[in-house]
Amino acid sequence: TEANMLPDDHPVNMEYKHFLNKFGEEGNLILMALDDEKIYTPEVLNKWIVLSNELKQFKQIDAVISINNLPILVKDTAQQRFVTHKFIEGEVKTQAQADSLQQILSEKLPFYEGLIYNKKNNTLQTAVYMNKKIVNTQARKDFILNDFIPIVKKFEQQTGLKVHTSGMPYIRTLSAQ
């Protein structure tokens, strides 16, 4: 393991402590969050979906839980059973659709609060789970520095929004710089 070379009051360490208090310790989890009024616009939602889908393509990533791939339980009255659908199918095309998604998420899907959204802070979050086998290897650092950070920066440049990122793999990589 790597020694923490940063002081306890360093912003990176403080952010990590806040992350642990809120989400607990998950050694392979990276959490990304947006906290801007522009989150629920078609442009930003679609770019957030693209970001999530891009991350899913990497072999270093086991799973990505984001607004676009949330399983939603729906009653099929004809078959008399429940089926699951994705929360967002395809592209968000209108502001009315974006507003509706926000309303459904915050009012009808409370079990996703804290994982995908935070109603109090108006944040939208994505959980990225790295392959546990690489968390303690150079492959983690290479992925974070050469793939993850550039993809996040591209999103930030395209939208003008700041992505808040935390989690053990991310913090350990930045701390080792």
Spell out what each predicted region is.
Residues E26-Y40, H85-K86:
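Extracellular/periplasmic ligand-binding regions of membrane signal-transduction receptors
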